[in-house]
Amino acid sequence: MNYYSASISQLIEEFTKLPGIGRKTAQRLAFHVINMPIQDAHNLADAIVKAKENIKYCKVCTNLTDQEVCNICSDERRDPLLICVVEDPRDVVAMERTKEFKGYYHVLHGAISPLEGIGPEDIKIKELLVRLSAQSADEVIIATNPNIEGEATAMYLSKLLKPMGIKVSRIAHGIPVGGDLEYADEVTLTKALEGRREI
């Protein structure tokens, strides 16, 4: 039996569709939204809709942006011969927090995972190859997560890029195996970047 009104039930149901949100958390969020001032609820709804309508892939690196080319790719002070490949837009933010990396990025939006049915064609590898054929690079640093999927992706990329005459390196594993890049602190990421190795 459903104890909530149709509107509350629908709100709870929508929150449960978010990753990591179970029924109890969805209920707490729903009641928080219901109890907030109406203007705050409108602002939240508007922010969600604007993000969905305006966010797109950067034409250069495939990071998420509301412009044709993201702020990082627009920054001419960066080293154009150095590209860091990451799995997720949040990894770009994590790397930028170190203030150590001065090149550009390429965001794959995932990692190769045969068990989940994710192959190379399902992530932004083709876009990376097109980019590298049009723009020269001395080194590509692969900063995928240190788990099975990240390692598989790194090895696959290495096999594709080495014949192009590009130095391919992998960030060092100051990051725990099985961990996510976005949760690593700046010092750990800095050390991992400094200790990268060629693959």
UniProtKB/Swiss-Prot annotation:
Signal peptide (from-to): none
UniProt zinc finger (C4-type) residues: 58-73
Keywords from the named record: DNA damage, DNA recombination, DNA repair, Metal-binding, Zinc, Zinc-finger
Molecular function per GO: DNA binding; zinc ion binding
Biological-process GO terms, alphabetical: DNA recombination; DNA repair
Family matches, as CDD domains: TOPRIM_recR
Toprim domain mapped to chain residues: 81-176
Protein family (similarity comment): Belongs to the RecR family.
Role noted for this protein: May play a role in DNA repair. It seems to be involved in an RecBC-independent recombinational process of DNA repair. It may act with RecF and RecO.
PANTHER family reported in the protein's UniProt record: RECOMBINATION PROTEIN RECR
HAMAP family found in the cross-reference section: RecR
Protein name: Recombination protein RecR
Native source organism of the sequence: Alkaliphilus oremlandii (strain OhILAs) (Clostridium oremlandii (strain OhILAs))
